[in-house]
A protein has these predicted regions:
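Charge-rich, low-complexity N-terminal segments
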Residues: 1-95
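A generic signature of intrinsically disordered, low-complexity regions enriched in glycine/proline
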Residues: 22-25, 104, 147, 179
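Short, solvent-exposed recognition patches
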Residues: 57-163
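A short, solvent-exposed beta-edge/loop patch
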Residues: 143-210
Length: 210
């Protein structure tokens, strides 16, 4: 006798096919949204601007000693009060920046620069160089011009201004056993910060270059 055949399965609903297709269509989009939400969750909105970040650790005394040895110019390590922090530094050249006393010709000058943060967070940079005054100031702000002077513990610093939004440049020439050095200070600090950095620098003897 012929065995009864099982009834054929009913075809899957088209809705199931559509649902599977929809899953594979929107799955990557959902995953992308989850990733984006995670990234945004690690961010924060600061309407007043970025907060205080970590100050880079820069060993100014070691860097200045290395610069004095490499550049062969008088370099001083400022004796700054507590709360001041060095955060950057480097060397640079100034083409035609000094006058050779033997020939009277303009030759290349060199400079070392260290950036400091005052206790109030304001940034100032200290540049020490064998350049002539006008060349050193011009390397910092080509539009600067002298507007007066400031007396710091009996030493005169020439003050240069360079426009409404430009930061002032204070400069003086310090003599020492290793020869003269032109010093320049500029930055976002006020007069008190300029004077503190100026006094901390001029009060020190230049490093001995072997």
């Amino acid at each position: 006798m012929t065995q009864p055949q099982p009834a054929p399965r009913e075809p899957k609903s088209r809705l199931l096919h559509d649902g599977r297709d929809m899953f594979w269509s929107i799955g990557p989009l959902v995953l992308a949204c989850v990733v984006l939400a995670g990234v945004l969750g690690m961010c924060s909105f600061a309407p007043a601007g970025p907060g205080e970040g970590r100050v880079p650790n820069f060993d100014a005394p070691a860097a200045l000693r290395a610069d004095a040895d490499a550049l062969r110019i008088p370099v001083r390590v400022p004796a700054l009060p507590e709360g001041w922090r060095a955060n950057s530094g480097g060397r640079e050249g100034i083409d035609g920046g000094r006058t050779d006393p033997a020939t009277g010709q303009a030759v290349r000058a060199v400079a070392t620069r260290v950036g400091y943060l005052a206790p109030n967070g304001m940034y100032l940079s200290l540049t020490q160089s064998n350049a002539d005054e006008d060349a050193l100031v011009g390397s910092i702000n080509p539009d600067a011009y002298p507007t007066g002077s400031q007396d710091v513990a009996g030493r005169s610093w020439v003050v240069y201004e360079g426009g409404e939004d430009a930061e002032p440049v204070w400069t003086t020439r310090l003599d020492g056993a290793g020869g003269p050095a032109q010093i320049a200070i500029t930055g976002a600090g006020g007069t008190d910060e300029y004077r503190t950095l100026a006094q901390a620098t001029q009060s020190q003897r230049p490093l001995t270059v072997p």
